[in-house]
From Swiss-Prot:
Species in which this protein is naturally found: Scolopendra alternans (Florida Keys giant centipede)
Keywords: Cleavage on pair of basic residues, Repeat, Secreted, Signal, Toxin
Gene Ontology CC entries for this record: extracellular region
MF terms in GO: toxin activity
Keyword hit for Secreted: yes
Principal cellular location given in the protein's record: secreted
Full protein name: U-scoloptoxin-Sa5a
Annotated tissue distribution: Expressed by the venom gland.
Length: 122
């Protein structure tokens, strides 16, 4: 951005000098040099502008791609959360069904704590 302003300033300066030389009646050789300089500066300025546009477009494209990736990841995460919430009651029932509960059992006069599968739903 700063470079393009500098180039614009130089271009304007060259144009002013070219006009000034034409008004003062400078010889044709100097006029041709100035004209070539102005053309070269103009061409360089246009190329720089094109490069800046391409960089800006590329950066914008990359930012959009990053946003799309983040949206996709977020959407996938939300979908997984919804699936887990839908499956939660079913999982809870399965856990209760298969849960082992401690019970006391008398064995030769000694109380032992043993784990017996829960008989809910059987």
């Amino acid at each position: 951005m700063i470079f393009s302003r500098i180039m614009r300033g130089l271009l304007c300066l060259c144009l002013v000098l070219t006009v000034f030389e034409l008004i003062n009646g400078s010889d044709e050789f100097e006029h041709q040099d100035s004209l070539h300089l102005v053309k070269r500066l103009w061409r360089n300025w246009e190329e720089d502008q094109q490069k800046d546009r391409e960089k800006r477009l590329w950066r914008n494209w990359e930012e959009e791609e990053q946003k799309d990736r983040e949206k996709r990841l977020w959407r996938n995460w939300e979908e997984e959360e919804q699936k887990e919430k839908r499956n939660l009651p079913e999982l809870k029932y399965e856990m209760e069904k298969n849960q082992e509960v401690p019970q006391l059992k008398r064995k030769r006069g000694i109380l032992e704590k043993i784990w017996i599968p829960n008989e809910i739903g059987r």
